[in-house]
């Protein structure tokens, strides 16, 4: 598969993004959110690792998170989807205002894909670490059916509001969650509990653990490719 590069988009009011296309006139899209301190280029190379030749052309959209001070890092300003005030992942300790603010920005990117001819039903919302947290939060509360949610090395935030905020359109959306068993940043068991909670709410979650740390390994990428191929083939 040869993926075409397109420049970062400067659309007024939208997050800047890096884009890759697997062909002309994309019919599907994957909006992929990076982790804390990274940027939209972080996962750009994985496009060349995937083999989607049997699928219609896909547009990969890698947004850059806003710059903000991160409390747990001494107030250092970096790209972050929300502030992290402590390493305590107890329910209710997330910086909910920042999560919601980022979710609103991702909603705007979803709307732009709609305007470019790709309906929500052909869009996968994906993310790693902080990006996965925002992908889960946004996708489960999105009012129109998505093709899927891909959440790597992360956890489900704001569980206390999910029952009242979850949208019926995505109650059966395919979800792939994966986590490194030696993750020292976001505990493996936290990710596993998040998947278990979603399964208890009857979301169709595929959960995978891997012998890696806070990163994505080759075996995981192969499983992600298989899952994406399946959900996008069903959607497109």
Language-model region placement:
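Conserved alpha/beta-hydrolase "nucleophile elbow" surrounding the catalytic nucleophile
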Residues: 34-36, 123-128, 180
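Short alpha-helix in the alpha/beta-hydrolase fold that links the catalytic acid
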Residues: 43-48, 163, 187-197
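Alpha/beta-hydrolase-fold catalytic nucleophile elbow
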Residues: 63-64, 126, 150-153, 178, ...
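Primarily recognizes the serine-hydrolase "nucleophile elbow" in alpha/beta-hydrolase
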Residues: 119-170
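Short, proline-enriched alpha-helix->beta-strand connector loops that line the catalytic pocket
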Residues: 170-175, 201-203
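Short beta-strand/loop motif that positions the catalytic acidic residue
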Residues: 176-179, 183
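C-terminal catalytic histidine-bearing segment of alpha/beta-hydrolase fold enzymes
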Residues: 189-236
